[in-house]
């Protein structure tokens, strides 16, 4: 009996160590994330609950010119410990008066932010820029995973330009490679990479897709939308041997928060029209 208890304790300890020695990373398009959403107790409670699942989370569609909502979000995430989460946020991005930010929240006891930069995609006033919201790239290090340093390239693609923007992520990848002399790069976000925005006949023209160096972890058959549509808009793509080897098999999935929390359609859709997509690194 004593031996059985010891075995059980060791198995439990091994499970805790596996959790501690891994990173869960997500990309979440929180539709129109701003002060209105963070002022709604019900919605903000669920958003915080979702984000607490992750060691690094990319939040897209941040509509918060003065970072008031971002401040409220960090206060909620850090309500028990002021150092639970840190953040890095881009400048407002967009070709017209409509602007969004990329926001990363991360656990500093799990990862360290090493560097960040805004990708230069051309002259916006001249009309020859590539992206509606050019990627704001970050570099992290972690002592707990097989890959010690990696970069994350975020993208919330404009639906009408999704094909061109996804293809141009290849150029961003090359830029990150050269700037930081690194191979282990994760590209993630709401690419609008499905249904009518990118059709099956168009995929072969996308460099990021046809190059075998890139692993697309969220398949075309996935559904990352909350509504009745079935579209794999949100994706995670990884490049680099160490990063690819660190991916826990079958861990890359959409997180269906509606099913997980037993929400009705109205509440789920008020949180967002997208599910987060997530992956675990070991």
Curated annotation (Swiss-Prot):
Q: Which residues form the active site?
A: 100, 156
Q: What is its EC number?
A: 3.1.21.1
Q: Which GO terms describe its biological process?
A: apoptotic process; DNA catabolic process; neutrophil activation involved in immune response; regulation of acute inflammatory response; regulation of neutrophil mediated cytotoxicity
The chemistry this enzyme catalyses reads: Endonucleolytic cleavage to 5'-phosphodinucleotide and 5'-phosphooligonucleotide end-products
Give glycosylation sites per the record. 40, 128
Q: Which domain of life is it from?
A: Eukaryota
Q: Where in the cell is it found?
A: Secreted; Zymogen granule; Nucleus envelope
**Cofactor(s) it depends on:** Ca(2+); Mg(2+)
Details of cofactor binding: Divalent metal cations. Prefers Ca(2+) or Mg(2+).
The record places the site described as Involved in actin-binding at 35, 89
Question: What do the Gene Ontology cellular component annotations say?
Answer: extracellular region; nuclear envelope; nucleus; zymogen granule
Pfam families for the chain: Exo_endo_phos
Q: Which cysteines are joined by disulfide bonds?
A: 123-126, 195-231
Signal peptide from the UniProt entry: 1-22
Per the record, the major location class is secreted
Under the heading InterPro entries, the entry gives: Deoxyribonuclease-1_AS (IPR018057), DNase_I (IPR016202), DNASE_I_2 (IPR033125), Endo/exonu/phosph_ase_sf (IPR036691), Endo/exonuclease/phosphatase (IPR005135)
Name listed for the protein in its UniProt record = Deoxyribonuclease-1
- Originating species: Equus caballus
Give the organism's phylogenetic lineage.
Eukaryota, Metazoa, Chordata, Craniata, Vertebrata
* Name of the gene encoding the protein in the UniProt record: DNASE1
């Amino acid at each position: 009996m004593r031996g059985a208890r010891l075995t059980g304790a060791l198995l439990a300890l091994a499970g805790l160590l596996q959790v501690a020695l891994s990173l869960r990373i997500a990309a979440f398009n929180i539709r129109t994330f701003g002060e209105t959403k963070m002022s709604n107790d019900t919605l903000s409670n669920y958003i915080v609950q979702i984000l607490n699942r992750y060691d690094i989370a990319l939040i897209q569609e941040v509509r918060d010119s003065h970072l008031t909502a971002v401040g409220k979000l960090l206060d909620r995430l850090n309500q028990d410990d002021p150092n639970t989460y840190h953040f890095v946020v881009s400048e407002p991005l967009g070709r017209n008066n409509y602007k969004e930010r990329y926001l990363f929240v991360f656990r500093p006891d799990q990862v360290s932010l090493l560097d960040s930069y805004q990708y230069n995609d051309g002259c916006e006033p001249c009309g020859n820029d590539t992206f509606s919201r050019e990627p704001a790239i970050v570099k992290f290090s972690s002592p707990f995973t097989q890959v010690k340093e990696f970069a994350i390239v975020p993208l919330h693609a404009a639906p009408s330009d999704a094909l061109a923007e996804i293809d141009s992520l290849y150029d961003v990848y090359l830029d990150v490679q050269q700037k930081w002399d690194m191979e282990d790069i994760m590209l993630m976000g709401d690419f609008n990479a499905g249904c009518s925005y990118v059709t099956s006949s168009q995929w072969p023209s996308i460099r990021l897709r046809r190059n075998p160096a890139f692993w697309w972890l969220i398949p075309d058959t996935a559904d990352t939308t909350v509504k009745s549509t079935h579209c794999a808009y949100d994706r995670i793509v990884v490049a680099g041997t160490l990063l690819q080897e660190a991916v826990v098999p079958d861990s890359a999935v959409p997180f269906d928060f509606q099913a997980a929390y037993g929400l009705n359609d109205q509440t789920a859709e008020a949180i967002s029209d997208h599910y987060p997509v997530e992956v675990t690194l070991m």
